[in-house]
Amino acid sequence: MPKARELEQRLERTEQQLRLFQKISRMMVREMSLPEVLQGIVSLVVEFTRCDSCLLYLLDDGELVLCASNTPHPSTIGKVRLKLSEGLTGWVARERRLLAISRETYKDQRFKYFGDLPEDTFEAFLSAPVIARNRVVGVINVQHKQPHQHTGDEMEVLTTVGEQVGCLLVVARMEPAALENANHVQFVLSSAPTTSRASGPA
């Protein structure tokens, strides 16, 4: 029975992951502003991970800028900035690696203390780079007030969400009219390797 129950729980968690990715994908294709979509994604991540804080930073002129958050600090959106050499967030962007700390995050030598953010005292920290076209364009952080052992599911989810946000940012740079009028077939075929274009059907 314990094994059966464990399998049920794993299946349920997998289904929750799929629903999360589906919700994010649907949000990405709706007619919503980019800030609204990013805010919606942050809310979905909070719901899945049951974290106390989720912050999304995007890269701007060599600095990471806070662009979305589930916690009420509207005055800090667009104003909190980190250099790539600063803090755990900067480390994740610089190293292009997932980072998980289960307790006493504030004692890590890489930690940057802001002084006016509640997250300064949070215990657990999970962070993943936002990747677009194989380049880091941001970082997404999940934090818990209390010590928290991050699961493999949570790490996988945050990594995938980082990739989804990266795809969203690439598409968001295109004007709607340009997207509608684009010759996608020609673009795909012209982007294919020469050998692929030259070979015919088997």
Regions inferred by a protein language model and the residue ranges of each:
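A short, aliphatic-rich beta-strand micro-motif
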Residues: 123-131
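Amphipathic alpha-helical coiled-coil segments that mediate homodimerization
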Residues: 20-28, 33-52, 56, 88, ...
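Acidic/proline- and glycine-rich, intrinsically disordered low-complexity segments
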Residues: 75-99
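Allosteric cytosolic regulatory segments
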Residues: 159-166
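Signal-transmission linkers at sensory-effector interfaces
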Residues: 1-30, 35, 137, 168-198
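GAF sensory/regulatory domain recognition
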Residues: 43, 53-80, 84, 105-107
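Short beta-strand-to-loop transition segments that serve as allosteric relay/switch motifs
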Residues: 72, 139-148
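Signal-transducing coupling segments at domain and membrane junctions
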Residues: 74-75, 102-124, 144
